[in-house]
């Protein structure tokens, strides 16, 4: 507690006693844990898996006597490309040929056949061309050198020394 009455002071007299208030006492905090509430786990309803049937075997289409025939021809005057091919199949026998113009202007023709008994066979024919292929010489253009440019530079600035005169009074 506190002192009930104030201390009496006399003018000029020393302090007779000092009084201090008693320390404040604190009680320990009361700790109470809040109750923990647990909810029952939610049960998830899962649908039964979908049953899949095994894929049905698909019978591959089989042609016991395959047949085809094709041909193409390229004559490109811009690039000089000249080639042709044709091929025919009847059952297991393939026959065809292709031709092209070689760089020297000759024409190469290949005739071929393929069958289960003889395998693949090719016969190459080479005919002299009507005109040899033009030879294009690639020459680099000469490098042009320019005379070095002369840069005009201004003359350096001249500075005069300061002139000190006598001041008149």
Curated annotation (Swiss-Prot):
Keyword Repeat: yes
TM annotation in the entry: none
Domain of life assignment: Eukaryota
Keyword DNA repair: no
Chitin-binding type R&R domain: residues covered: 65-135
Sequence repeat residue numbers: 21-24, 27-30, 33-36, 39-42, 47-50, 53-56, 140-143, 146-149, 160-163
Organism: Locusta migratoria (Migratory locust)
Protein name: Cuticle protein 21
């Amino acid at each position: 507690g506190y002192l009930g009455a104030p201390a009496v002071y006399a003018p000029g007299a020393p302090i007779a006693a000092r009084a201090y208030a008693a320390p404040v006492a604190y009680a320990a905090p009361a700790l109470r844990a809040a109750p923990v509430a647990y909810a029952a786990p939610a049960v998830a309803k899962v649908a039964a898996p979908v049953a899949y049937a095994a894929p049905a075997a698909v019978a591959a289409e089989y042609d016991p006597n395959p047949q085809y025939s094709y041909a193409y021809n390229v004559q490109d005057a811009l690039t000089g490309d000249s080639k042709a091919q044709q091929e025919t199949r009847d059952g297991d026998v393939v026959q065809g040929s292709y031709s092209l113009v070689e760089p020297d202007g000759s024409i190469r023709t290949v005739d071929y056949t393929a069958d289960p008994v003889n395998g693949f066979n090719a016969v190459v024919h080479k005919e002299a061309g009507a005109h040899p292929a033009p030879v294009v010489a690639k020459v680099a253009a000469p490098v042009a050198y320019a005379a070095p440019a002369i840069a005009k530079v201004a003359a350096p600035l001249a500075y005069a020394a300061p002139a000190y005169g006598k001041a008149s009074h």
